[in-house]
Amino acid sequence: MIIAFFLLIQCVYCVIWPPLSVDNEVALRSQRDVSYNVSVDQLVDVGVRLSTVIFERDTYTQPYLNRVDNLLNASVGNILIDAYWDEGGFNWQLCPAPFSANVTPIADGSTILQLEWDNKQYTCDRRLDLASIFTRIDEHIRASARSVSLNLITIYMSLHSIGTQNPTPVSQPGTLSRPLVRSIDQVQILTPASLRVAQLSNSTYQGLEFDPNGYPILGELLQSRGIRVIPIILENNMYEDTSYELERDSNLYFIQNSTIDVTQTNTADTKLTDLTTNITNWTIADSQALLSESFRLVMETEEDPFSLESYTNHISHGYSPFLNRKYNESEIRQFAVNRLWSWKNSYLPEVSVPLLGDQDDSNSANETLQCASFSNLSWIISSCDEPRQVACRNSSYWLQWTVTSTLSNYYGATEACPVGTFFDIPRTPLDSMTLQREIPLNSSVWIDLNTLDSGGCWISGGAEAECPYHRVTLVSLYVEILTPSSVVSIVLIAIVVLLHFVRIPIQKNRKYWRKLQDNIKDSDGIPS
């Protein structure tokens, strides 16, 4: 009872990442699909530091771990895990205090311990470790393997030392790799070796352009190779004379400043602030300079937390913002719904065609609202019949855009582009920035995105493009419609049908039934 009450009190403060609405899912999926031909180091999404956003700074127990599922189900693409190496116990753990420290169980036989370390108090569950998080990630990977919500997860690790060094080595010390490969199939992990193979086979890129030292594109990893995870050791804050040898994990993890160069900065960087507030004077050279930097991250600090404006500015300029403090539900919801660089506010407008929109409904006011235009760094649902200028990409230099001087409806957009260009859509935030510089403020142009083939399935490829998810989407939606109440109704109908065809045994033996009725009629006791 004590443990249950303790966990209940903790969970009052659990931060719940809001689930995706249908509109959120459609928006997120269309942005992902448009980015399929983009190298994975140029992808932009919100990141979450688990130790500060999900866990309390001093509490590591199961109720908080359950909140990781919310992040994964919402397809959050970047997760930062603080891992602690117990120098005395030779093991990795999530708890910032060594279990060999001054320990007090909260109840007899409990795995939840009160620990005192470095003049701080911690509450930690012994059962909660790195494998606990990796297992949740694996469960998400398996659940979404055949789903339209397929996504890539980049796991960043920040390493710390705790405890007193033990002069006596052990035969099998812990490693970061062991819990990862025991939880997630290694074929689903991009490793330094598999990246090198891709580079040698000339299948790596920088953005949309071939680069022998670049990274695979998103579509190849997800669709062709089934890779779902990129593990990166981002920060090494361990003792200088630590007993842990980082090279043990170099075959599985990318290591910052060794096998990978992550561009990491924080909100206190005034140079970055100047960069991310520049929109009107943005140049192709600005985009090209940032493209040379891989996995661009910006971490908020206690002194300079994200505002909603700075958060969205970083996303628009190609940086993945990492949430790194405690939030209330209202704040976290604002950041969650503004995480996309494409459809602003993460929502498709209410006038959008539903996911299962009836294409034959001639009375629908939304029947022509099936095409997308671009304005003020945002995709906007528009009527396909409206005349607009057209966004055309240079065939030789992918960051160069041309906007037609003549107007066209969506159906004629492909033919409207001049020689040497083609009708296309911005596929990264930096791509959007270079297109925006060609468009007058508050004006809009056609981009190659529509839902003409199937309501809610936003695809590029012109007006004749076919939705690859139509059948899958229908099936998944019908499964969602089959709610528990529907299941109960079906079971009740089955019981009624079963009783209709199967007679109860007592009615089959009519002779015995009549004898039983006669016996009941006999008086029992003294007649009055």
Swiss-Prot record:
Its signal peptide is 1-14
Broad class of where this protein is predominantly found: membrane
Mapped to this chain, the residue ranges on the Extracellular side of the membrane are 15-480
Regions of this protein lying in the Cytoplasmic compartment: 502-528
Transmembrane stretches in the record are 481-501
Q: How does it sit in the membrane?
A: Single-pass type I membrane protein
Q: What protein is this chain from?
A: Maintenance of telomere capping protein 6
Question: Which GO cellular component terms are attached?
Answer: membrane
Q: Where are the glycosylation sites? A: N37, N73, N202, N257, N278, N281, N328, N366, N376, N394, N442
Report keywords, A-Z.
Glycoprotein, Membrane, Signal, Transmembrane, Transmembrane helix
In terms of Pfam families, this protein maps to: TIM-barrel_MTC6
Q: What does this protein do?
A: May be involved in telomere capping.
Is Transcription found in the keyword set? no
Compartments where located? Membrane
Q: What is the lineage of its organism?
A: Eukaryota, Fungi, Dikarya, Ascomycota, Saccharomycotina
Family membership: Belongs to the MTC6 family.
